[in-house]
Amino acid sequence: MNFDKEKCDEWEKIRLNSSPKNPFTKRNVKKDGPTYKKIDLICKHNVVGGNVVDLNKLCLKWLKDNHPNVKIPKSKSPPKVKSPKRKKSPVRRRVSSPLLTDDEDDVLNLQYDYLLSYRSVASEEITNYLRQTINDKTITAGNACMSNTKTLLKYFTNVKAVGKGSFGTVYIGNINIKNNVFSIAIKEGQISGLEANRAKKLQFPVEYLFNQMMNNILNNKMCPSFNYTYCIHFCDHCEVVSAIFKNPKTKSKITTCSVTMVEKADSDLIGLTSLDAQLSALFQILAAVHCIHKLYGIQHCDIKIENVLKKNIPKQANEYFRYSLDGVNYFVPNTGFVAILNDFGVSFSTSPKISTSYFGVRNAKVVFNNNSYKFQSFTTQRYPQENKWGKIETLSPPPRLRGPGGAKLTLNKFMKNFDSKPSIFVDLEDFQKFPTFGMYQDIQDVVRMFVGGKQTVQPGSHTEMRGLQPQAKKAILPFVEKLAPTSIWPEDKVELFLANVLIHKIFTQFGYTNAPPNAIILETYKLP
């Protein structure tokens, strides 16, 4: 039984009878019995109609209420996009009819739907469509479900489950907007009852705030390597797989889920065999990591090949994406895909503007001397640590660092409402001058994703990328390092902590800063 407005209206009229008739099967049902309750759940008779969650407005409201000092750049209105000049190819990609508005001057040519300019226009259209269309009793508080009651299914065609586990289920489905078909991903994932209750009061888990930040990076054309998030719903009775301890069999359980609708990708990074493709993937991932580190102090905490997706795009010879970073242009060849940094479920921010408590371990300052970046260590006099009741206590002096000279250096940990008494002024909002140890961990996960090694935060290990080219491996291996929070940060290895510096170290040797002759520039991105 799925939601049907006419049948639910009929149910509303007869549900209080002693033996009401099921409007879906025309059979009598026992009042307050299991079938009766299921019909009530589907029709949600006792809930006032609601609207789809507008992620942008709610996250901005959350920011304004909780962190008024955070400044997120306002997205510019999507420009009318000119198609890049391309040489004709004997292999033509199927072109859908023009999109999206009633104004013929603002059509979107889906032949170039992989460009960020087009993706931003499509995102706005899809978000508006979902907000306007999915807006009736189906999605009222806690009843927007892909599994179990399946109240959302009627809005999509060709729905397929493409991933399933204890976290929930990932679906892909199509929506039709003005005779143009778009595929989107729908993630139905388990959340706690506490998170669900907070969400209904518009107090969203921080992951949703991060999704909004990724949308802003995309809308401001800084970096294309994130998924657009369109909207978020909640389901009080979703069905997920529940693993039984010491039993190989599994069964499903009914729980509470968030249902997040996002831009669809095609696969993870498995299958990259050419040197150009491997280098392009490395550049794109490091560019995305640089954005989240510098702008928001976000530590991803789970970068691995399964969490970097791939959006396949058409390619032709001599096509490039231009990235502007620190005053230098990098020309990244179009190798047939856009890499997407995905899954911020365990991420957190150490920015004082966002974090509610922890501002990170910062053992050194980045200085620029003799045309190179170097670390300059500093010390603190006090060290915060939480007791078993969660109260911050002071440890003086702080723990010392390991290695030659470490006895004179301290482990510098910063937290909200705690003065660590540093020996120099520390700007906790400047992640380029005062990086955190977590930034090193993210970058190590990126390079180890290619050459192999232990994951830095999560349990498990990266395996070497299958088919990794010797030139790529040789370029990456020098930047694999094993540091602990109590290690002395290597003076001449700032690139281990700053993704932008690592980009320059690796990609100048492959000629990425040299403008290719007669290059077709598909799009330009201005990294922060």
UniProtKB/Swiss-Prot annotation:
EC number(s) on file: 2.7.11.1
Region annotation (Disordered) ranges: 70-96
SUPFAM superfamilies: Protein kinase-like (PK-like)
InterPro entries recorded: 2-cysteine_adaptor (IPR014901), Kinase-like_dom_sf (IPR011009), Prot_kinase_dom (IPR000719), Protein_kinase_ATP_BS (IPR017441)
Keyword Nucleotide-binding: yes
Record keyword Ribosomal protein present: no
Keyword annotations: ATP-binding, Kinase, Nucleotide-binding, Serine/threonine-protein kinase, Transferase
A Pfam short name: 2C_adapt
Composition-biased stretches (Basic residues): 73-95
Catalytic activity: L-seryl-[protein] + ATP = O-phospho-L-seryl-[protein] + ADP + H(+); L-threonyl-[protein] + ATP = O-phospho-L-threonyl-[protein] + ADP + H(+)
Positions annotated to bind ATP: V162, G163, K164, G165, S166, F167, G168, T169, V170, K187
Domain of life assignment: Viruses
GO MF annotation: an example: histone H3T3 kinase activity
Gene3D superfamilies to which the protein is assigned, alphabetical: Transferase(Phosphotransferase) domain 1
Family indicated by similarity: Belongs to the protein kinase superfamily. Ser/Thr protein kinase family.
PANTHER family per the UniProt record, alphabetical: INTERLEUKIN-1 RECEPTOR-ASSOCIATED KINASE (PTHR24419), SERINE_THREONINE-PROTEIN KINASE HASPIN (PTHR24419:SF18)
Name this protein carries in UniProt: Probable serine/threonine-protein kinase 380R
